[in-house]
Amino acid sequence: MRREAERLQDMLDAISAIERYTSQGRQAFDEQELVQVWVVHHLQIIGEAANSLSADLMNQYAEVPWAQIVAFRNIVVHEYFRVSLNLVWAIVQNNLPPLKATVERMVQELGEA
């Protein structure tokens, strides 16, 4: 089983990939199906990694909506055709920046422990 620090790094790697794929803006995202699929895939990775974190660690960082992250992953995996591109874009723009900042802090604090 992978350690929590590795799962957190998986999350950061996925966020970095999403940032690269979406750097050209909303219009490019809307026009490029491959980018849409790749972004959704990386959101799935984030949800999978979050799902593997211990309850203790998630409780220490309760400001993160862990349950929503995992729930979105479940929708992506099991009900893919319900995924709204507007919602995906909103997650990328509004939710990933604070998640990235918190996960970076988590990695740093775990490294210091």
Q: Where do the language-model regions lie?
A:
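Solvent-exposed interaction patches of small proteins and small membrane subunits
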Residues: 1-113
